[in-house]
């Protein structure tokens, strides 16, 4: 009787160890798969509750106003004029993660537009901000673009300064027009694009 009980306990211990090892291996493999995939492929807000044509990522151009102003442009290779940039919404510069793999170590809500834009809602029953761009770079890094070399561009003057590397951006676009605070729902677009600046009055930026 004692031998049978000991054998039974030993078999249960082996079974538990086997289940634990299998679960750990499965989680490790899942993490490895995630690290090999672009983050935006796992982003639910890019494809849900959108009208036809919305939520599809394209290689669009983007014009930004340097003095805390920004207006995303969604058609491919489009550029805003200075007047259009001047009438757009504010832009926030935020610290950058060290690598794309670092995103997986944090809650995905860190880059979700609905989470980030919630901090901008101050009063109820106001029109939701239509579009907004977050640049996840140190402000001094953005300013340093003006210390680079001049290149041709489509902004006013035809000459711009190009960033030495693509900048990390989160583009937020209102999912449906006519929404009012606090019920604002945004689509999230995560990308990296090079920034071009005129640097004349530091009011124009373009990213491609």
UniProtKB/Swiss-Prot annotation:
UniProt xrefs under InterPro entries: RNaseA, RNaseA-like_dom_sf, RNaseA_domain
Parts forming coiled coils: none
Tissue expression profile of the protein: Male-specific expression in proximal caput of the epididymis (at protein level).
Consequence of gene loss (knockout): Mice are viable, anatomically normal and reach adulthood but display impaired fertility consequent to an inability of the spermatozoa to ascend the uterotubal junction (UTJ) canal of the female reproductive tract and gain the site of fertilization. Spermatozoa fail to establish a strong association with either epididymal epithelial cells, the zona pellucida of oocytes or oviductal epithelial cells, yet they are capable of fertilizing eggs in vitro.
Family annotation (SMART domains): RNAse_Pc
Location(s), subcellular: Secreted
GO molecular function list: nucleic acid binding
Signal peptide as annotated in the record: 1-24
Any one GO cellular component localisation term in the record: extracellular region
GO biological process: epithelial cell morphogenesis; heterotypic cell-cell adhesion; male gonad development; positive regulation of cell-cell adhesion; positive regulation of flagellated sperm motility; regulation of fertilization; seminiferous tubule development; single fertilization
PTM section of the record: The N-terminus is blocked. Glycosylated.
Glycosylation sites: 125, 147
Entries under Pfam families matching the protein: RnaseA
Protein family (similarity comment): Belongs to the pancreatic ribonuclease family.
PANTHER family noted in UniProt: INACTIVE RIBONUCLEASE-LIKE PROTEIN 10, RIBONUCLEASE
UniProt-recorded name of the protein: Inactive ribonuclease-like protein 10
Gene (name only): Rnase10
